[in-house]
């Protein structure tokens, strides 16, 4: 995409957005040029809240499929567009409704906590949904005397168990991008930047090992990373998450330096959303995301509980 072509395309996207009475929501892992045309860039919790409060008739969701589903469930009266229907999620794909039903059959009084990175059919079986930003707070409020099943990310679940002191049954799912970030990627970077603060996403597979290398690490959601970096006195940060966040970190804290633990930690699903696909989505109103009401109605309760916390 040439410079003029990119700028012209961005202008067309903004024109169509006004014409369609649309809002563009983008996750922090999106390509920089997609983030730049968005009305709001944030994490799953922020995006869900923004989708709930918008007055626009059309929501163009620049993220992955479960995020667009979430927007559609929370806004059944609005049109939700996903610029590329192939923008999936390996973590959301890892768990099936049958997995949850099998656990519930063994624990009839149990509570199912579903990470937002799940399909609508799994959310419909959950008691509450969480994001990485509010999982600890939500779980800490749950009754002490009932078993809890945390699905599907085992690393986030382990972090929540550590932080709350609660015993959780964990589904063995993982995000392939975050699971691939290892201690060996971190060691040399910390040695090269001894004064840097270390920001790590709770989905990372190296959680305990990385904390051993850097005990004062900050385990944060993507939104938490942005907020922390802006307010911290440190000038350098080592960052363990998908590299799309770097664009936002540099934009919101331009006087600071950010170093990715794994420069090739790229979610190919997030990167399927391009500026051209956003343009075509708005132009042709294509790839409408719909969730059947019998599923959406049950999932909505769990999502509304999530949006209310944190």
Curated annotation (Swiss-Prot):
Pathway: Cofactor biosynthesis; NAD(+) biosynthesis; quinolinate from iminoaspartate: step 1/1. Iminosuccinate binds at residues 27, 44, 115-117, 132, 201-203, 222. It catalyses: iminosuccinate + dihydroxyacetone phosphate = quinolinate + phosphate + 2 H2O + H(+). Binds 1 [4Fe-4S] cluster per subunit. Its cofactor is [4Fe-4S] cluster. [4Fe-4S] cluster binds at residues 89, 175, 267. It comes from the Bacteria. SUPFAM superfamilies: NadA-like. Its EC number is 2.5.1.72. GO terms for cellular component: cytoplasm. It is found in: Cytoplasm. It holds the Pfam family NadA. Belongs to the quinolinate synthase family. Type 2 subfamily. Catalyzes the condensation of iminoaspartate with dihydroxyacetone phosphate to form quinolinate. This is Quinolinate synthase. It comes from Thermus thermophilus (strain ATCC BAA-163 / DSM 7039 / HB27). The gene is nadA.
